[in-house]
């Protein structure tokens, strides 16, 4: 589970009914009190958390969790943001006080692909593939911290206004995403969900074949 918001986690109780074996990895902060401003609760339903806890199939993770030689989960909570992050009104309730969400509950799946064959060098090379949910800590920060060869996830750009045909924020994002590889093979990006259709189209014009859109049920070969 990428983070503790209802639109990502509330379906897990139903998932347990239709799947009788898979383990679910949830960060221990995912059961926190998360809101949009102070007006609307957007965290996972406490009843779902209870069902998950009692299922015996949930692994509650901390900042880093190693699943096996290829798969690991990390929060990057110990990292310092290099690029500014807009919380977009997302908060957490601590006691009786609402504060900007620190997104301690957000985690990323890192896949260390040790079997990829380079089409140019015809040799086996390692690749790092990162899966992010909504990238609340900032897609630019995540790329800076994890240095992926492939990144799949939402960019959380859906509220950025592109109606004028120009956006400083998206221009900066495209520039950084296109150059943040420093001697490595340039990162390939697949995006979806909270990026926004108009925002994706804006980025696509600037990132060209380095950015593709994903839809539910779609299969891509990376």
Residue ranges and their predicted role:
Residues 34, 68, 81-84, 138-141, ...:
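Short acidic/glycine-rich loop or secondary-structure boundary segments that cap or lie
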Residues 38-41, 63-126:
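Active-site-proximal loop/helix segment associated with metal-binding centers of metalloenzymes
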Residues 12-17, 64-68, 141-146:
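Short amphipathic alpha-helices and their capping/turn segments at secondary-structure boundaries
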Residues 25, 59, 72-74, 152, ...:
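Hydrophobic/aromatic beta-strand patches that form the interior of the parallel beta-sheet core
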Residues 3, 24, 70, 133, ...:
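Divalent metal-coordination and catalytic microenvironments
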Residues 20, 51-57, 68-69, 185, ...:
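A short helix-to-beta-strand connector/capping loop
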Residues 2-63, 77-85:
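Active-site HxH/HxHxD metal-binding segment of metal-dependent hydrolases
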């Amino acid at each position: 589970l990428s983070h503790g918001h209802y639109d990502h986690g509330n379906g897990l109780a139903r998932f347990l009914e239709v799947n009788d074996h898979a383990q679910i990895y949830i960060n221990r902060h995912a059961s926190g009190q998360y809101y949009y401003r102070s007006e609307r609760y957007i965290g996972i339903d406490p009843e779902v958390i209870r069902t998950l806890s009692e299922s015996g199939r949930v692994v509650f993770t901390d900042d880093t969790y190693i699943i096996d030689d290829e798969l690991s989960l990390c929060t990057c909570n110990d990292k310092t943001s290099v690029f500014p992050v807009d919380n977009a009104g997302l908060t957490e309730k601590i006691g009786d006080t609402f504060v900007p969400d620190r997104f301690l509950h957000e985690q990323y799946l890192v896949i260390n692909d040790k079997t990829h064959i380079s089409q140019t060098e015809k040799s086996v090379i390692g690749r790092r593939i990162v899966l992010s949910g909504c990238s609340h800590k900032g897609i630019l920060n995540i790329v800076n911290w994890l240095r992926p060869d492939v990144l799949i996830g939402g960019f959380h750009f859906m509220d950025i206004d592109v109606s004028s045909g120009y956006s400083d924020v998206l221009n900066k994002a495209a520039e950084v995403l296109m150059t943040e590889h420093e001697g490595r093979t340039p990162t390939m990006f697949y995006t979806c969900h909270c990026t926004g259709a108009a925002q994706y189209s804006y980025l696509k014009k600037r990132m060209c074949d380095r950015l593709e859109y994903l839809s539910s049920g779609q299969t891509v070969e990376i």
